[in-house]
A protein has these predicted regions:
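Substrate-gating cap/lid region and adjacent catalytic-acid/histidine neighborhood
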Residues: 115, 153, 157-374, 390, ...
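Single-pass type I membrane-protein transmembrane alpha-helix
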Residues: 66, 475-499
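Cytosolic C-terminal tails of single-pass type I membrane
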Residues: 498-510
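Non-transmembrane alpha-helical segments in soluble domains
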Residues: 1, 60-63, 67, 93-96, ...
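Extracellular/luminal ectodomains of metazoan preproproteins built from arrays
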Residues: 163, 426-465
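Extracellular juxtamembrane-to-transmembrane boundary of type I single-pass membrane glycoproteins
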Residues: 457-483
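Serine-hydrolase-like catalytic core of hydrolytic proteins
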Residues: 1-144, 148, 184-187, 191-211
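Non-catalytic, well-ordered alpha-helical segments in soluble enzyme domains
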Residues: 373-396
Length: 510
């Protein structure tokens, strides 16, 4: 079992994931690796001067070493499972579609990371290289060879420090030095490749994520609606989005997460604003920053756009390939002996790794000391290692005496979108949060993939007729957006009805 660590492609290391308990309990060989990170691992000039993806090439070199040498450790070179979390999970997905990775592994597990997330692949690498070169006072930022020659004369630590400066201005500093479509490791963007027949390694895969997602305390973020707008636009990474498209997208997000499903205080404040606007005592745009998402709502937005929606889109695309067996999960366990889980909102980013690597069995002095923690760890280890051995996390006729509480993990298919909820008592459900996933995977692309074209003229100091036309065009855009939203939600409702409702448990065959 070959583990690829996460860390936004710029931090972390294999040494933080001790594999001895997983290896002993699961009777497998565990390999953890390091690879080049940040600007040293993923700088790309978008040409042959510096193609990028050096961190991924390091991973391939490690996989080749395993293939050539694992037999000396009692392993099978034709039975290698790659698994990774967060950016490491995205790397797993990229290896699935890379021609350079073919034949180096036989199974794959992508945990809380998808190669089709907007953060997973950089579409504007040249911009950040030029920004870095300016920070380092390179003489010519327009010539790739000159930039590279300049960088090679500068101390690596200084380059790393300035690469952090080069990301300033990006909301939450999503990774900017990250994998690129270089024409060799990654022939095209992941979504395009996943839609092409024969474009991926025909191996079993399962992917999933946590029930909740936090890796920083949202209460420490001075969040406003304007900041949320910038964050959304940064994540969708669409420079051509017009002001009206961005406003409609932001309004749709607020409608979905705050106004429709927000807290009682949100609804109360919204009604007060609507009353003021109807009385003419408050202009419409004055409420731009006054209704803010609470911590849970903010975490849900970040989780959905970063990880959950891309994970669902990934498994849906994988079902188009008959040669690939797909399993999907959600980790939903939070120990009462976990200070991070108590501080945030339950299971959090990377929390399942503690159980997969057997931390509750390592006699920690300050966390994960409960009997339930050990039981969940045993469950996760068995599921992960059974998949590594058999290509099925709950194989029938194997280890029957150790079956996870008569739990059978069913495949995720185009006809039956099953997923497993993992915790003390795993169970199978269907239609994973389908309304919100449909919102991000089908409704939002209407604005990010297809620009709304409007006149660049402003309404200030223009004739009355032109002003009316501008307002009419604006109204038409909003009306179209609302109609599309209604259609998407209707389709979602039909799907939910077809699948017998969200989170409806499926009888488990014994």
């Amino acid at each position: 079992m070959f583990f690829i660590h996460g860390g936004s492609y710029k931090t972390n290391g294999g040494r933080f994931y001790p594999g001895e308990w997983l290896a002993a309990a699961g009777q497998v060989i565990v390999i953890t690796i390091n690879y080049r990170l940040g600007v040293l691992g993923f700088l790309s000039t978008e040409d042959d001067t510096a193609k990028g993806n050096y961190g991924l090439l390091d991973q391939i070199l490690a996989l080749k070493w395993v293939k050539d040498n694992i037999a000396a450790f009692g392993g099978n070179s034709s039975d290698v499972t790659i698994f990774g979390n967060s950016a490491g999970g995205a790397c797993v997905g990229l290896h699935l579609i890379s021609p350079m990775s073919r034949g180096l592994f036989s199974k794959a597990i992508a945990q809380s990371g998808s190669p089709i997330g907007e953060w997973a692949v950089q579409r504007r690498p040249r911009m950040y290289v030029e920004r870095l070169a300016k920070k380092l006072k390179c003489p010519d930022v327009n010539d790739s060879a000159t930039i590279l020659q300049c960088l090679r004369k500068i101390d690596p630590e200084q380059i790393i420090d300035k690469s952090e400066d080069a990301t300033l201005g990006e909301i939450f500093c999503a990774p900017v030095f990250s994998p690129v479509a270089d024409g060799e490791f990654l022939l095209k963007y992941p979504t395009t490749m996943l839609q092409q027949e024969g474009s991926l390694s025909p191996v079993p895969l399962y992917g999933g994520r946590k029930k909740a997602y936090q890796d920083k305390d949202p209460s420490s973020i001075p969040f406003t609606k304007d900041l949320l707008r910038k964050y959304l636009l940064h994540l969708v990474r669409k420079d051509f989005m017009s002001g009206i498209a961005a406003d409609v997208l932001l309004h749709a997000v607020y409608t979905e997460y705050v106004y429709r499903h927000g807290t009682t205080s949100h609804h109360k404040k919204r009604r007060q604003q609507q009353h003021k606007m109807s009385n003419g005592t408050m202009p419409y745009y004055e409420n731009n920053s006054s209704v803010l998402p609470d911590i849970r709502t903010l975490g849900k937005i970040i989780s959905d756009i970063d990880l959950k929606a891309p994970s669902v889109k990934l498994v849906n695309l994988l079902t188009l390939h008959p040669s690939v067996s797909v399993y999907m999960y959600e980790f939903d366990y939070a120990s009462s002996d976990d200070v991070i889980a108590n501080k945030y909102v339950g299971s959090y980013h990377e929390s399942e790794l503690y159980y997969i690597f057997g931390f509750p069995h390592m006699n920690l002095s300050n966390a994960l000391r409960l009997p339930e923690d050990k039981e969940v760890s045993n469950i996760m280890i068995q599921l992960w290692t059974d998949f590594a051995k058999h290509g099925n996390p709950t194989p029938r006729g194997v280890n029957e005496e150790n079956m996870v509480k008569n739990f059978t993990w069913r495949q995720y298919t185009e006809e039956e979108d099953c997923f497993a909820t993992l915790g003390l008592q795993p169970f199978v459900a269907r239609s994973y949060e389908s309304e919100r996933m449909t919102f991000w995977n089908h409704f939002v692309p209407l604005f990010t993939e297809y620009p709304i074209l409007i006149s660049p003229n402003h309404t200030k100091n223009v004739p009355f007729e032109e002003c009316n036309f501008t307002y009419l065009l604006t109204f038409a855009g909003w009306l179209l957006a609302i109609i599309l939203l209604i259609l998407v939600l209707h389709l979602c409702s039909c799907k939910m009805f077809k699948n017998f409702g969200v989170m409806k448990k499926i009888p488990i065959p014994v």
